[in-house]
Amino acid sequence: MIWSVDRRLHSRALADLDAQVIRLTKHQQSVAGTVADISKAGVCLILPCELRPGELVRLEVADSRLFGYVAYSTWKRQAFRTGVEVERVLLGGSDLAQLLQSALQDTMPAVLSR
């Protein structure tokens, strides 16, 4: 489910979407998390572990992929609140991907459908 909210520098769409985060290192470790919000600057994730600022990651949400790098990762309320600046988006064809596309429509760079 996605709700609109306006705060900070960019307006945000609140979200509650399952995501898989893959570290784009030689070991390509992955961790499950939740997309908490989406904005022009990127996405905010709730994760069980810390990611390093500057680390390259791939996010898998439904059948869509978002590529970017970690902007911050801070401990808050029993989890790490992690910001990812998104550089590229590849959208899938599922209903959830269409919902994601509507949230990303005017905020993300290079949104592509598969």
Which residues does each predicted region cover?
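N-terminal helix initiation/capping motif
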Residues: 1-38, 88-114
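Short, surface-exposed secondary-structure edge patches
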Residues: 10-11, 46-50, 73
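Short, conserved beta-turn/loop elements at beta-strand boundaries and strand-helix junctions
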Residues: 24-26, 40-41, 73-78
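Short beta-strand-centered aromatic/proline hotspots
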Residues: 31-33, 67-73
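Short, solvent-exposed secondary-structure boundary/capping segments
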Residues: 43-47, 76-87
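Short, charged beta-turn/beta-strand-edge "cap" motif at the junction between a beta-strand
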Residues: 50, 63-66
